[in-house]
Amino acid sequence: GVMRGREFLMKDSYSFNADEACLEETYQTMRNTYKTVLERIGLDYKIVSADSGSIGGDASEEFHVLADTGEDTIAISDSSEFAINTELLLKDGEDISSLEGKPSPDGNGIIQIKKGIEVGHIFQLGKVYAEDMKANVLNNEGKATTLHMGCYGIGVSRLVAAAIEQNNDDKGIVWPHGIAPFDINIIAIGYEKDQKISEAADSLHAELISMGYEVILDDRKDGYGTKMKDSELIGIPLNIIIGKQFIENNEIELKARTGESSSNDIGDTKTILDFFKNK
């Protein structure tokens, strides 16, 4: 599926700093940048203390999107930001299940075991590679000093897969607003037969697009059931249904992908958008 495609996109970057303090500052900047990315998308995630592995270095952290289908097992506190790869917490011979319910090592709350999908990894490499490459720079005193390196990677296409794994139901995808392919789907029932419906759908479509929203107009000849199932499968956050109710009393139905619904006057765009933003 999407998680293990033959092609993937990665964002990799490196930093080269004059000293350890400068590396720490850059590291925190990148850490906060990755946090911003995940928060803007709308994902539930944890920053996990990790083993640097074969890459080496002084410190590393992984960014995990929480999902029951995740390949990694992580231990988190129920009362703080503490999170760590279980392999770093387990003692020889211990089973993962033995960690559940134990006091958190940071003294706050108890340990819970969760599954996560790793979408990012950041490292403080220090001088490990710079020394081998003889990567030196003159400091303020004019003396040669070895650079301190940092390494930062985030899986761009893996973020999409993780978002799907975390946000879905038996009908299909439930996209977070931040990365949904469309914000709104206008389902026009009888578009090709009723001029009142087609004109209203076209007008609302144009208005919402002019306001900066990504909007699709489903003007196919298919019935309501087919159109709604397709929209739920794709995961568009809001459906606006223009059909029989509109012909009878000028009302449209608003239906969020998360299940909430409401009837609304077609001319009250503010209420429509408030409904969208709150779902």
Predicted regions and their residues:
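NTP/phosphate- and nucleic-acid-binding module
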Residues: G1-K279
